[in-house]
Amino acid sequence: MRKLIGRGGPFVLTGAFVLSGLLMAPLIAITQTAERSRTQGLKETDKFVKAGGNTSEAVGTAKLQTQKTLDAYNALVTQPSKNMKGDYKKLMKSMDSMNDQAAEAGRKVDQMQQAGDIYFTGRAETIKNIQDPQLQDRAKQRLVDSQKDFGGVIESLREGAKALEPFRKQLSDQITYLGSDLTPSAMASLKPNAEQFNARGSELFAKTDKAIATANAYFQGLRSAES
């Protein structure tokens, strides 16, 4: 037994008190670790969901810009132009924006993949802290299912971007072709392929829209309910 002097007078520090403090310290540390783990998991989820939203938006923007470029191309090729040079300059500007947006979409998909790796690794670590075996198995299965769904999401986005790439390059080639011979006869020479080219574009745009919708639904399911 030890007697300590404080401002309010002496108080006794018993062995039981010391033992209680020693036992409580690990419990407090475990609680703090669990709290940090839970908070970190929420942060990682938020970052993952945000990365998914940014990716869907970037892919959608790239698709819309490709559509705008195709529309500008169609207007120049299929309709008489009173200002051929001016319209072509606008088309070139639209094409440059299309290429920039496509590159940005590719970067966002890669960033989403990285965020997914961090999210799923952290989630797997958190599951290890579940003591109930049945509950832990259920959490593991949900993790596996979520990873599988995410694999489908990212694959569909990559496939959508991959499918648009040759179309975008072909569109760029035809725009360059016009630039080398900016005459009414050159435009007329492209008209026979315009309808088929546009039909192909519509099919690819629809495929991209479907991929974006799938991604949005997946990430919406990961959002925490907010009061």
What is the role of each PLM region?
Residues 1-7:
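N-terminal secretory signal peptides that target proteins for export/translocation
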Residues 59, 66-83, 95, 102, ...:
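Secondary-structure edge/capping motif, primarily at the C-terminal ends of alpha-helices
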Residues 52-66, 95-98, 102-116, 150, ...:
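Long amphipathic alpha-helices with heptad-repeat character
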Residues 29-100:
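Immediate post-signal-peptide N-terminus of mature secreted/exported proteins
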Residues 43, 50, 83-86, 90-93, ...:
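A structural signal for alpha-helical segments
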Residues 12-25:
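Bacterial N-terminal signal peptides
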Residues 108-191:
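Extended amphipathic alpha-helical interaction segments
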